[in-house]
Amino acid sequence: MKNYETVIGLEVHVELATKTKIFCACSTAFGGAPNTHTCPVCTGQPGSLPVLNKQVVEYAVAVGLATNCTITQYSKFDRKNYFYPDNPQNYQISQLYLPICRNGSVEIETANGKKNVRIHEIHMEEDAGKLVHDEWEDVSIVDYNRSGVPLIEIVSEPDMRSAEEVIAYLETLRQTIQYLGASDCKLNEGSMRADVNISVREVGAKKFGTRTEMKNLNSFKAIAHAIEGERERQIELLEMGRKVVQETRRWDDNKESSHAMRSKEDAQDYRYFPEPDLVPIVVSDEWIAQIKAKQPELRPQKLARYKKEYDIPEYDAKILTESKHMADIFEAATKLCGKPKKVSNWLMVETMRLLKDNDMDADAIKFSPVNLAKLVDLVDAGTINSSVAKEVFEKIFREDIDPEQYVEENGLKSMNDEGELKVTIQAVIDANPQAVEDYHNGKKKAIGALVGQTMKATKGKANPAVVNKLLMELL
């Protein structure tokens, strides 16, 4: 079999975090009752006219600046004409000829090192409604709440060569956009969606192969599986002497396979023409400067600051800053208790373990920095020991309980009175003569059994190090 190279480009749609839609005052809130966040504008009623939401432009420019794009200072909207039930106007207001941002790049890092992925353009557009096919066999229903929600579409050049590079690119984009506050980028809620354009060609060939577009990719895992599946399908066709058809394919995560949806359209198929109801967008130097001045600290700068300000290893700083949400928790808890390394340890070890056990990502963390800081202080003061602290943290992780109140109500404070502890230890010694004899006969491991029995007798409230010290004294 010949050696093949995979060529991948992405179209990433990101719902912007505005309170209202791109061309009307309807709410963009996720999860409302069907068709309650609608009006004549976003449902395409005759006579209704769009008015551009200024915040959409500012978010688009902010993302463009953060991805090294050139900002188009004279930009226009265009009509993309197509007929589909989720599109009540029978056209979408988008940008083809003069998109808001062009010629950017993002740096990604994989096991093979660092690489720049070029961004062809970023354009603004409105989202479509949502079709639901599962209620009845012969009827589809549509919810127009999403119709008119503002999007930016980030179109990459075909610079990626593997699923690993694609995931690294998407993670970098998501982190950047979340840090900007431009979107929450939740794939499971559809606020970040990626269409994957993929082709294969013989290694060394200059000409691109025929591409297909993969849709219905709702997680990074699905994206990786779809890329591998489509790569294998195209190679199999070429090895059989058949042609790859330019088409849009729908990925089925349950079946781990895809099926053809429609032939892949080109721009001319949509009969684009300038949007007559919206004036051009003029982005002045002053406006760009204002947007740039408001930009928050992005991940690369935060990572460098953590290493310097908190003396945290680079690996830990990378984990803490992967999610803006986790970074915010870390900084807030550190500000409250003043112990960055101890806060970092709770996030790096116990939090990551519980996230993995519950198949969650860091953006799903519900506990408050206040309660994490209180837990750090309780351990630091010796009020509770490390084993009790882990029990308390699990409650914080799941229910965001107040650790001080929980420790008090459940009698979990450490036994810090050595006199009281000696009485308990002596009782353990008296009840375990064989372990005592083994210890005196040189079997040093026997002390561990006595420590364990003491911890059991104190219901885990004693400090194991103190127990060990007192046992040595009494023996």
Curated annotation (Swiss-Prot):
Instruction: Tell me its EC number(s), please.
Output: 6.3.5.-
The alphabetized UniProt keywords are: ATP-binding, Ligase, Nucleotide-binding, Protein biosynthesis
GO biological process, any: translation
- Catalytic reaction(s) noted: L-glutamyl-tRNA(Gln) + L-glutamine + ATP + H2O = L-glutaminyl-tRNA(Gln) + L-glutamate + ADP + phosphate + H(+); L-aspartyl-tRNA(Asn) + L-glutamine + ATP + H2O = L-asparaginyl-tRNA(Asn) + L-glutamate + ADP + phosphate + 2 H(+)
Q: Which domain of life is it from?
A: Bacteria
Please name the Gene3D superfamilies in this protein's record. 1.10.10.410, GatB domain, N-terminal subdomain
Q: Supply the InterPro entries for this chain.
A: Asn/Gln-tRNA_amidoTrfase_suB/E, Asn/Gln-tRNA_Trfase_suB/E_cat, Asn/Gln_amidotransferase, Asn/Gln_tRNA_amidoTrase-B-like, GatB, GatB_C_1, GatB_Yqey_C_2, Gln-tRNA_amidoTrfase_suB_CS
Q: Does the keyword Glycoprotein apply?
A: no
Q: Which GO terms describe its molecular function?
A: asparaginyl-tRNA synthase (glutamine-hydrolyzing) activity; ATP binding; glutaminyl-tRNA synthase (glutamine-hydrolyzing) activity
Which family is this protein grouped under?
Belongs to the GatB/GatE family. GatB subfamily.
Instruction: Report the HAMAP family cross-referenced here.
Output: GatB
Q: Which NCBIfam families match?
A: gatB, PRK05477.1-2, PRK05477.1-4
Name the job this protein performs: Allows the formation of correctly charged Asn-tRNA(Asn) or Gln-tRNA(Gln) through the transamidation of misacylated Asp-tRNA(Asn) or Glu-tRNA(Gln) in organisms which lack either or both of asparaginyl-tRNA or glutaminyl-tRNA synthetases. The reaction takes place in the presence of glutamine and ATP through an activated phospho-Asp-tRNA(Asn) or phospho-Glu-tRNA(Gln).
Name by which UniProt lists this protein: Aspartyl/glutamyl-tRNA(Asn/Gln) amidotransferase subunit B
Q: What is the scientific name of the source organism?
A: Agathobacter rectalis (strain ATCC 33656 / DSM 3377 / JCM 17463 / KCTC 5835 / VPI 0990) (Eubacterium rectale)
